[in-house]
Each structure stands twice: as structure tokens, then as C-alpha cells.
């Protein structure tokens, strides 16, 4: 309910979910007032958590509050998920997978909220997309990793290109 409360009117939320809990997620989203307006599948080139099957995808629902404007360039419903090699967090999302979502579903200078920020991938993607961000993380080790990561990205963005003075 809190996500629905803080989300602006006529806005979208993207929620990643575990396939084995989709019924609980769906009930919670609908009880909060969200409408499900899309589903995304991210294909991986590697397998995670192989038990009965090796999982090579991640999924997310696109949820709406009100009637958000349609994106100028709609995304395909199947997107890539490139492993970055960064292991700041056990369920880290690649910035390259999050950035298209942010750029498609928000406008420049909008605020992107990640209430489960982990090591800050969503915040990095928002920053690199010209959006403001709020990241919330309860575990100190991931909060610290996220702060360090964002500071490094901000430093890199403030530095000029190597050929700026030519």
C-alpha cells in the first residue's frame, strides 16, 4: 500500500518478482490499487539456482497508478540481461537492463524510487539517465556498497572525456 501511496498519479512502477510467489505479489498489487499493464521477461546467458530447472530469465510486472502516458518508444516485452560480473549483492540487477526501463517509463529529471535498493543498480541507472533517485536499503553492507558505487559513477560523470581539451 505504501508504494501506491507515494507513487505520483498517472505513473508506472516496475516490480521484479519471484515466480514461486506470483500469487502473493499479484494479490498485494491489486489490493493496493495497481493495475497490471505489462509483463517483462529478461533473458539471461547464464543459469541461476538450478534445482528442477536452470533459471535463465528474470521477470517483472509493469504496474500503473491511474492512467500513465504511453511511452514514445514502447519496449519489447523480452529484453536482455547481461551479467556484469559485479557481485555487490546476491540479486543484483544489471544497470544495462534497468536503464531502458527508466528511460522509457520516466521523463528527464523525474524521481526514481527503489525501496529495495540493494547495491544501488537502479540508482546508478537513474543517474546515468538524467533522473534523480531515492534508494532505500536496510542492510548496512549493501547500503555502503551502493553509496561507494554511486560516488564512483558521479566522479566518472564529472570528469571530462580524454579528448575534451584537444
What kind of feature is each model-predicted range?
Residues 147-166:
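S-adenosyl-L-methionine
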